[in-house]
UniProtKB/Swiss-Prot annotation:
This is Cytochrome P450 monooxygenase atmQ. The lineage of its organism: Eukaryota, Fungi, Dikarya, Ascomycota, Pezizomycotina. The chain crosses the membrane at residues 22-42, 51-71. GO terms for biological process: secondary metabolic process. Keywords: Heme, Iron, Membrane, Metal-binding, Monooxygenase, Oxidoreductase, Transmembrane, Transmembrane helix. It comes from Aspergillus flavus. Its main location: membrane.
């Protein structure tokens, strides 16, 4: 039997050479496969007991039961998380996956405690194998501290909100350039728009404008790499995570994310050398790269060009991946729900008329219905079944007595909460004005903005680890939708049907090839002066 298998492998892979056999002997590959199976069984047994947490189990108990649950996880992860939330939503539960146990914290008091832990206690870097995929954010390496990147983004947000600063106007022009460059519509009739591919590249342009500025924001090679990197990090991370620690460096060599990261590092370092040769004064700081460079000068000899480049590149994944997902859902949901088009367009045009046809940050923030529509699209199509994803870097015990061993992966439920009738009445129904009404009824509109977070809306995280780039993401999505509403009519491509979402483990993705159709309107008031 093994000889037949050997010949089959030899024919299809060319990796196994024929070896003469002897009584009680077997080819080397048989021993290798056996050793790998034993190693995997031993690893499974070790992980099962090491990361066991004393909370209810969803899907299966024991070694065999947890294996069955792990296979179920690949196809039905979101339903397993929902099952756990429905049964144990007042405390916590755990589910077995093919590589580990995952613990979900549901109790509000524990979530409040958990959301403010530092990276020294709970870290997010293991989720996408950051050591290999996002070196600028990895643990145990010399790097620009992550909070510094967050401060740089805050500086840029302040620029966007300052009326005398040209940054926001430049950002709008970059968006319009990116839209025209990436769509290339050839006629005035209906044109197909691939939401994911085009959306990814437009977001890549805007991310480049924010991080490295003009003219790199229009460099084709850089935009290609930004767009590829946003999708390469999670896929590479998932692949590397399947291997034991000793084999992860080897597995990483076959992944695209480390290679793209290295190429981006070189591009940013080349740009840094150009800027060093022609230094700018501090008032002329134009982008995140400039800001971090000036910050690093307060610590002479501490940070190299590679450290700065890696910190810039580490922001690319978060800036592109989630933003693009939400943007695609917004485009497809708008196309299949024409009842929202006129009211949203009217809101945008009213504010543009008020502001003399100028796009302003203040005007964008006044588009409350548009903001609500975007947030409802995100709620109705939640990217992940879990949120606040972290790995325990040391043993920890919550104030309620729950003990979390080192190495345990911890989450809070996300999609089950967003469809819980206790928190969102008529949760199964799409309501684009849901958050607009909540803001009006409560008199606290800021609490229901797209960028706002609370215990029942954790899609951007919360507490110490809330996403610092969510403001830029919100600007990109709302500006692009507003631009389309004013300049184009929109409709679904295929007989009114929405391109279907699909899932992989806990993650929900839009149809990567899904399309809508756009047709230019006769009135165009979107171009800035």
């Amino acid at each position: 039997m093994y000889r037949l298998l050997e010949r089959t492998l030899d024919r299809f892979t060319g990796l196994v050479e024929y070896q003469p056999t002897y009584p009680f002997a077997a080819p080397t590959w048989v021993y290798l496969v056996g050793a790998i199976l034993i190693q995997q069984l031993a690893t499974r047994w070790y992980r099962y007991y090491k990361s066991w947490v004393n909370v209810p189990v969803v899907g299966g108990h024991g070694i065999i039961g947890s294996w069955i649950a792990a296979f179920r996880w690949t196809a039905r992860a979101r339903s397993l998380v929902n099952e756990g939330y429905q049964k144990y939503g007042d405390f916590a539960f755990q589910v077995s996956t093919p590589t580990r146990w995952e613990v979900f914290i549901c109790n509000d008091e524990m979530v409040r405690e958990y959301r403010n832990f530092t990276d020294e206690r709970f870290s997010a870097n293991a989720l996408f194998e950051a050591k290999y995929t996002v070196p600028g954010a990895a643990e145990g390496v010399h790097k620009v501290p992550v909070p510094i990147v967050a401060k740089a983004l805050t500086w840029q947000r302040t620029r966007a909100a300052t009326k005398t600063d040209p940054y926001f106007e430049e950002f709008v022009k970059e968006l319009q350039h990116a839209f025209d460059a990436e769509t290339k519509f050839e006629n005035e009739d209906w044109n197909d728009l691939c939401c994911f591919a085009t959306g990814t590249r437009i977001v890549a342009h805007l991310t480049a404008k924010s991080l490295v500025g003009y003219p790199l924001s229009r460099d084709t090679e850089l935009i290609d790499l930004f767009a590829e990197y946003g999708n390469a990090v999670p896929t590479s991370g998932f692949f590397i995570a399947m291997f034991p620690q000793i084999l992860k460096p080897f597995a990483a060599k076959f992944c695209s994310a480390p290679k793209i990261s290295a190429r981006l590092d070189r591009i940013v370092m080349d740009e840094l050398r150009k800027r060093e040769a022609n230094p700018r004064s501090e008032p002329q700081v134009q982008d995140i790269t400039d800001w971090i460079t000036f910050w690093s000068r307060t610590y002479p000899g501490t940070y190299t060009d590679q450290d700065i480049a890696r910190s810039v590149v580490s922001a690319v994944f978060g800036a592109i991946h989630t933003t693009t997902q939400v943007l695609v859902h917004c485009l497809t949901d708008l196309a299949i729900r024409p009842e929202y088009i006129h009211p949203l367009r009217e809101e945008v045009e009213t504010i543009l008329n008020r502001d003399d046809q100028q796009w302003t940050k203040e005007g964008l923030e006044s588009m409350e219905k548009l903001d609500s529509f975007v947030k409802e699209c995100q709620r109705f199509n939640p990217l992940d079944a879990g949120s606040l994803a972290r790995r325990a870097t040391k043993d920890f015990t919550f104030s309620k007595g729950l003990h979390i061993p080192e190495g345990t992966f911890v989450f809070t439920p996300n999609s089950p909460v967003l469809f819980d009738e206790k928190h969102y009445p008529d949760a199964q129904q799409f309501d684009g004005y849901r958050f607009y009404r909540l803001g009006r009824v409560t008199g606290r509109p800021l609490e229901y903005k797209f960028i706002a977070a609370n215990l029942k809306y954790l899609q951007f995280g919360d507490g110490r680890h809330i996403c610092p780039g969510r403001f830029m993401a919100a600007d990109e999505i709302r500006l692009l939708l507003a631009h389309i509403l004013v300049n184009y009519d929109i409709r679904p491509k295929d007989d009114g049907e929405r391109p279907p979402n699909w899932t992989f483990k806990k993650i929900l993705f839009p149809d990567m090839k899904g399309m809508v159709q756009l047709k230019r309107r006769s009135i165009n008031i979107s171009q800035p002066n």
